[in-house]
Design a protein with these regions (language model features):
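Long, contiguous amphipathic alpha-helices that act as assembly "spine/axial" helices in icosahedral shell
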Residues: 1-23, 84, 169
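Structured all-alpha helical bundle cores of eukaryotic regulatory proteins
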Residues: 13-41
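Sequence/fold signature of self-assembling virion shell proteins
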Residues: 30-71, 78-83, 89-171
């Protein structure tokens, strides 16, 4: 049973694990995270213009980019970041960024703008199945985002053998 649950988690995480891979193209012919998704009004991007590790600057830029998101016609949709999804390798960085009242990694006495403005209200979640140790994702409040469908739910069965006492199990 644990193996089946693990497989389900791995396959679900693969959506994000392959998000930057051009070999995993979606319906528009682009990877999930791309700088040139084709839309009616031209192209749109859903990743940083320049790839960056998780830090104060990249988190703030991500939230600025999310706030500037537009629909397929180029109209602003006033999106907001809701939760950050990170691999376990970034949990300490995320904790400092999301819980410190002051700016992280600096002696300045500035406030932590992300925290004081409540820009990521649900904080962060660690996904232990993410394989890229420096990739981070931000879930937004935009409806109809990533969805998970179970086309055919897993069925299990057990059968005991009276003669040998063995139990057979299948999924």
């Amino acid at each position: 049973a644990r193996s089946m649950a693990n497989t389900k988690q791995v396959k679900a995480a693969n959506v994000l694990n392959n998000a930057f891979s051009s070999s995993s193209a979606g319906g528009d012919g682009k990877e999930l995270c791309a700088t040139d998704h084709p839309i009616v009004a031209g192209t749109d991007r859903n990743e940083l213009s320049t790839a960056a590790d998780l830090n104060e600057t990249s988190l703030e830029q991500s939230l600025i980019d999310i706030a500037a998101m537009t629909d397929e016609r180029g109209l602003k949709i006033a999106a907001r970041g809701v939760k950050m999804i990170i691999p376990s390798a970034l949990q300490f960085t995320a904790e400092r960024l999301m819980k410190s009242s002051g700016r992280t990694g600096t002696a300045d006495n500035d406030i932590n703008a992300v925290v004081s403005k409540g820009m990521v209200p649900q904080g962060y979640a660690v996904n232990h199945y993410l394989t890229d140790t420096d990739a981070f994702f931000i879930k937004t409040d935009v409806p109809n985002g990533l969805k998970h469908f179970v086309r055919a739910p897993m069925k299990t069965a057990m059968e005991g053998d009276f003669t040998t006492g063995n139990v057979r199990y299948k999924a």
